[in-house]
Amino acid sequence: MVRTTVQDVARAAGVSVSTVSRALTGGIVSPATREAVLEVATRLGYQPNRAARGLITGRTGNLGLIVPDLRNPFFADVAKGVTARARAVDHGVFITDTDEDPVAELEALATLGRNTDGVLLCSPRASDADLLAAADPESTVLLHRRVPGLPSVVADIAGGIRQAVRHLRALGHRRIAYVSGPEDSWAAQQRLAALSAAGDLELLPLGGLAPTFDGGLLAGDLVLDSPATAVLAYNDLVALGVLHRLAARGVVVPERMSVVGFDDVSLAAMSHPPLTSVAVPKDRAGAVGLDLLLGRTGATTEREAVLPTGLVVRASSGVARP
């Protein structure tokens, strides 16, 4: 099949090639000319060559997305939100997985920053100082991380924690084991701070574990060695590991122990029992972040978006045992 060229569109529309280029890239042409060129381009099935368009506009039409672990369904959902929104606005996305390594995050930021129009960065581990030194605030948006001076999209972590604590309190729980994430993780610090501010409960922090299913398996034994009647996990993968370990040791959930996760990934509804979890708008965060990056939102000068969270109650949380 012969590919339609910009010259074909120009001939059919009765205009010059440069006029077609301006019409298709937002340049200065009359509304009537733009409409006529777009109609012809659509009728002929013309697909602009992104590289050639970049020579005209100085932009690549591509964006970068950096995530710490694509095996975690949380970040897979974020990526879905980014790519779906990018497709809707005719952009491509290069995705890099940094394997929870802050050095790799900064290296990927440098590489993608040179080769794309902007970068969406999920960076749980890199320090604020390193991010401020490496990231261009005009072409970088942080996802699920806040660093003063850089645009960001974050979830209302404190609000989600408060909902989870209210839920467990209403069920009679006063001794709650918190299986925290990595100590250098921004999200882990935010969640622990929100829990510590909750008051009226005995918080039993269990830290130093990986934010993974295997980390949750190890946490299950620590929970059973504590006086806790409920567990709040750093994320759903950890919570699912806890559930698995409790089941292996004959502990019935929620009759003997309640378990609450954070993120509400798709696996949460498939566990046994289904996992109560704080829902974070993962794909929406990706879409909002992309809009911030492309300047499509009319956001405040701080360029920060805070997205609401909500507790999804399922069968893993119940009344505290006497």
Regions found by a protein language model. Give the residues of each.
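Alpha-helical recognition/docking segments in bacterial nutrient-uptake
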Residues: M1, L65, R71-R166
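Periplasmic-binding protein-like
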Residues: T116-S123, R175-S180, L206, S226-N235, ...
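Hinge/beta->alpha junction and helix N-cap segments in small-molecule ligand-binding domains
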Residues: R50, P68-D77, I95-A104, V153-Q163, ...
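N-terminal helix-turn-helix DNA-binding module of bacterial transcription factors
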Residues: M1-G61, R321
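Flexible loop/turn connectors
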Residues: D225-P322
